[in-house]
Amino acid sequence: MKRSRTQYAEEPEENDDFNPVYPFDPYDTAHVPFVTPPFTSSNAFQEKPPGVLSLNYKDPIVTENGSLTLKLGNGIKLNSQGQLTTTNTKVLEPLPHTSQGLTLSWSAPLSVKASALTLNTMAPFTTTNESLSLVTAPPITVEASQLGLASCSTSKLRGGGNLGFHLPAPFVVPSSNALTLSASDPLTVNSNSLGLNITSPITLINGSLALATSPPLDTTGSTLNLSVAAPLSVSQNALTVSTGNGLQVSGSQLVTRIGDGLRFDNGVIKAHVAGGNETLRGKIILDVNYPFDATTNLSLRRGSGLIYNESTNWNLTTDISTEKGLTFSGNQIAINAGPCGLTFNNRKLQVKLGAGHTFSSNDNIALNSIATPYDPLTLWTTPDPPPNCTLRQELDAKLTLCLTKNESIVNGIVSLIGVKGDLLHIQPTTTTVGLHLVFDRQGRLVTTTPTALVPQASWGYKQGQSVSSSAVANALGFMPNVSAYPRPNAGEAKSQMLSQTYLQGDTTKPITMKVVFNGNATVDGYSLTFMWTGVSNYLNQQFSTPSCSFSYIAQE
């Protein structure tokens, strides 16, 4: 006898004409290519895959080497008889482990009732809404989950939780626990009566306190008054003194009012003189010394060279002869040195020497036996010029610059030394020190802004240790090549030369020097720009750089 055929999910439910003897479907034999195995039950059996009878199981049952077995977790194992057992589990009190299994240890007031742990209670404790509570009656109360004691306005809880009476002073309870009245002078308690001690000027009149008075005090009605006469008065319920000119009340004293020029000396008012004044026989006079004169009026004794200038409201001025080489520069007398033959060097007036001249051993001008020719291949400021640059203030730096032409290359040496202001003492705002030298289309130095060299600075062809008196007419051969360094081009890397140097020649004070060729955008000629950065790291020190070299391609 054959079992009925298991219906597959892909077959319609109405396919109930299966023939177990002839199992092949006449309409589609591909669905059942063989005869299925004997009967299956939905309880733990299944036909999977089709035509194969297998068990239907779930975790913890698994198969291992073709046999059924169980997955075992922690604390579970099989003994040698194939029995499922548990291992001893570590427990802590109150859960002891016995041969009967885990139990619970307890003690009173805990107990087990109806297999449940419960709490035994006695009045005034009770269990309400599955919570332990306390049954109370007045004056005991429960407020905000705390047990309290109701009290009235005259009672209070003292320290230690004792109930007592709230007694304001002067009521007290001494050690006898009797309510008494505390009294202090002038009150007394005699023979269970409250009394009052009095002394003059207080007295008793008809059982009432009264005040005995004598002039200038008197009583009007129930008020004590003070009789006053000028200059005394009563102001704002206080006795005061009325004052006139020269007097005032200061603090609690009547004092004299004094103005400027007066002072107290041992309680006596005296004139306070200072700044060229003194007192003589009760009079204030001027105490002067030369060059002042105070015989009649205060005047100034003048010597030669000083005059009163009527055009300046009779101010005292210096009388100089501007026709003899003197002039005013600001508020200072200066030498008016003309452009020819004279110059200033290290703040000294000096004669300019041209070609063929020199100073003799006794500092006289003499002719050179052999005139020193000038060098047309070198332009410079002389090797040690005086202050010749204005960067932050007038003549605050000394620039030493030498340009030497070598075929198509110009080699340069530069050094800058600060002599005053922010360059003598570097400030936090002095982050970069820089200067421009601007040249016209012929390579001649432009002595106006933005050129840093002042107009009177030495600049020209090298001749001996000075500059040639011959003017620089064409110096294109010393100029930066505009094809190599187009203008303006301050941001072009090719137009810059960078080198590291050291402030004051100290290798522990590194700074960076940058030379820019034709970088000034305000000119159509040529320019050299020198910048030193990183100087703000050395505050209050003198800005001074070593001699640094640089090179560039010449225009010609």
UniProtKB/Swiss-Prot annotation:
Question: Any domain commentary?
Answer: The tail region anchors the fiber to penton base capsomers, whereas the shaft, built from several repeated motifs, allows the knob to protrude from the virion.
| Chain segments carrying region Disordered | 1-22
Q: Where is the signal peptide?
A: none
Q: Which InterPro entries match?
A: Adeno_fibre, Adeno_fibre_knob, Adenobir_fibre_prot_rpt/shaft, Adenovirus_pIV-like_att, Attachment_protein_shaft_sf
Q: What does the annotation say about its assembly with partners?
A: Homotrimer. Interacts with host receptor CXCAR. Interacts (via N-terminal tail region) with pentons.
Cite the SUPFAM superfamilies for this sequence: Fibre shaft of virus attachment proteins, Virus attachment protein globular domain
Instruction: Name it.
Output: Fiber protein
Q: What induces it?
A: Expressed in the late phase of the viral replicative cycle.
Question: Any extra detail in the entry?
Answer: All late proteins expressed from the major late promoter are produced by alternative splicing and alternative polyadenylation of the same gene giving rise to non-overlapping ORFs. A leader sequence is present in the N-terminus of all these mRNAs and is recognized by the viral shutoff protein to provide expression although conventional translation via ribosome scanning from the cap has been shut off in the host cell.
Keyword Thylakoid tagged: no
Subcellular location, record wording = Virion; Host nucleus
Keyword annotations for this protein?
Capsid protein, Host nucleus, Host-virus interaction, Late protein, Viral attachment to host adhesion receptor, Viral attachment to host cell, Virion, Virus entry into host cell
Family membership noted in the UniProt record = Belongs to the adenoviridae fiber family.
| Any single GO BP term | cell adhesion
Task: Reply yes or no: does the keyword Acetylation apply.
Answer: no
